[in-house]
Structures are given as structure tokens and as C-alpha cells.
Amino acid sequence: MQKRLVRKLELEMLLSQIEPHPSPTPSLEQYTIPAEVAATMLYIAAYANDDIADKTVLDLGCGTGRLSLGAAFLNAEQVVGVDIDKSAVRLAFKNSVRLNLRERVQWIAADIDVVQGSFDTVLQ
């Protein structure tokens, strides 16, 4: 069964609904990627490079989940989002519930060295 092609604007609209970090920590280099930029990055990864759909995706420094949730929306087989900031991961979880993508992403609040396994695609 062929999966439907997601329009870039549809992806951008979804990503714009993700709640940003309320108080980013400069020492952790936290910033919110604009929805338009994130959609472009993910769209290229998904459709130009075939690196998202049916792939295992790791999002290092996932923050509030913008790239992780976008990858899940673009039909990644499995998505793991990792961030050392527990409050960011809590917000990523809330975002995934609100966008009905909770079952598509595993969230880990820890340093990246705890991640085990292999992944087809790494986002950061």
C-alpha cells in the first residue's frame, strides 16, 4: 500500500502548532527552529533523500519535538527523540499527545550517550 504524499504546507502547518520551549537555556544552545525551516529540512530528507518514510529516525537534542514529530508525521517507522533537558522532553511528550502522534515517538530525557541501537537517519 502506497503512503500518501504529505504536502509541505500541511507539514509546516502541523509544525507551527508545536509549543516552543518557554525558557530556553543558552548554555544548552536551545532555540526554536521556525516551522517553515523545519518543514523544508524534513521535506528534503523525506522526499529528495528518502530518509524518513519507513526508516528509523533518531533526533538528537530534540527539544520540544519539532523534528521528531515532523518525522513521525512523514511516516517514519520509528522515531526516538533525545534531549538532556527534562522540561523540553515533557513538553515534547505533551506536543505529541496534542497532535495525536504519541504512539509514533519514543521520548528519552537523558544525555545522548544512553542511546543504543542503530538508526537509518539522525536529525539534530
Positions of PLM-derived features:
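Class I S-adenosyl-L-methionine-dependent methyltransferase catalytic core
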Residues: 1-124
